[in-house]
Amino acid sequence: MMTLSLKTADFSCKTNESGQSGDLRWELVTSEERISLRLHSEKETELRSVVLKFNFPFERHDMLYLNGYQSWTDSRERGVKGRMHSLDRVPKRIVEKFSLDRYGDNRFVLYGRKGQMHGFSYGYVRRSEAYTLFGSLAEESGFTVLRFDTGENTVTLEKDCMGHHFTGDYTVFDLVILHGAEDEVFDEYFRLLGVAPAKGKRLTGYTSWYNLYENISEESIAADLKGFAGSKTLPDVFQIDDGYENAVGDWLVMNERFPHGMKDAADQIREAGMMPGIWLAPFAAEKKSILVKEHPDWLLRNENGEPQPGGCNWSGFYGLDIYNPEVRAYLKEVFDTVVRDWGYKLLKLDFLYAACLIPRRDKTRAEVMYDGMRLLRELAGDALILGCGVPLAPAFGVVDYCRIGCDMTLNWLGDAYMRPLHREVPSTRNTLLNTVYRRHLDGRAWRNDPDVFLLRDDNMKMSEKQRETLAAVDALFGGVLFTSDNVGAYDAEKRAVYERIEKLDRSCVTKIKSTPSKLTIFYREGRKKSKLTVSTR
């Protein structure tokens, strides 16, 4: 049984077939393998909601995966009694004060009870080794929110299209339902999407973030580079993270800790034998930035004309209006300078969801994000893009590498005060789980970036076993293998672990066992059989 619920500004209906009301026509086509819904209106029509529900027989031991909204959103297999927590455990005044509902989907998706879970763009039901994949082929017209209700035995599709105005044709849903083994269903899904396999090599590298965080300087970068001197094998990339700029948004104004500028830093990295990489958040502007002070008209604004906050990082930040010609001209100047003048060849582009914090009258949230990703690809030219903090589907086939989990933390579970917050909060355990459960994206959509591993003893709260578990998982499933350690300071024992980790890759994995309470990974290191076990509760 299938039910379509369609609501516009002046019409609503529930039906299970195609139909027409005045100037609005809808065409619903269903089969066992594909479901599509297309609208046509002769006059401008405002959509309020489009929901399509059909039956699915969940079984007691099924494992369910629903892709989270963006890079950082926790995305793991759950049992049929699983639940996703929203911000309902956090006082509203705290949510509003720190803009905690901006990182994920809390402002535009309702969360359900136990056994009611949702995701974006695609998801699957795994029954032992047999997969049933539900995948949207029509994401640019609006994000498809996919819901599993295991108590009701239903699958629901919802279009993120509230307030969208259209005239003419509008494809709401185009869903494929694929059955088979893991590789079978995902190979076919990405073939249908028209996304060519990602052939980029696995990158090894160093990033400055998880040691000094924003407190980097020319001196600290030089010291980190010196740490690699004399290494048997240099990493591919040395990436300078946040902390060099005056403020987020002021990309061409360096702070006092970088008096010689970023071209000088890139030259030093090249001279050391590595590819220069740099961090940018191109669609974000910090409240205290020169950009916000001098160009308030560049900011995204809500229906009340107020700047749209994107979160509480730094001094708080706003999203930029990517359709403003002056914003686009500024971003072109930034990318031309960073790539062509300074010489950075890998761009870590972060907080990208800031572009689509609010939809436009004539563009859904997804359309805005797709436009934003095309803009970045054009601006970057032949520089490598490592996407981060981005809704995933718009980045498929656009970025070369992409973060597929939240930030790791110096302890295992993340800070206790942050755990009840949104699903994007930093946590080593959560990002490790995302690395495993989003493994199907690696080599298909891009090469996966699982975030860094750390083996060091100083400035560290994880046990040695936890550190080595993270490093092994990153190597087994990642297309990026970065650290923030001073590798030159490793003793012989840590150097041996580092060299052993570098030899691991996906071909070493022999089996993955996932239950509602734990994840077990079986793999080989040469002739040695090994396994890793991680709690998923």
Residue spans of the language-model regions?
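Carbohydrate-binding surface patches
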Residues: 34-35, 468-470, 474-482, 513-537
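N-terminal accessory beta-strand-rich subdomains and adjacent acidic, glycine-rich linkers
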Residues: 1-185
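Flexible loop/turn segments at secondary-structure boundaries
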Residues: 212-216, 245-249, 283-288, 354-358, ...
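Aromatic-lined carbohydrate-binding/catalytic grooves of carbohydrate-active enzymes
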Residues: 202-206, 210-336, 340-361
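Short glycine/threonine-rich loop-to-helix capping motif typified by GTGT followed
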Residues: 359-368, 399-400
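Glycan-recognition surfaces
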Residues: 292-329, 333, 374-489
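N-terminal carbohydrate-binding accessory modules
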Residues: 180-197
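Alpha-helix-loop-beta-strand connector modules within alpha/beta enzyme cores
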Residues: 262-269, 365-383
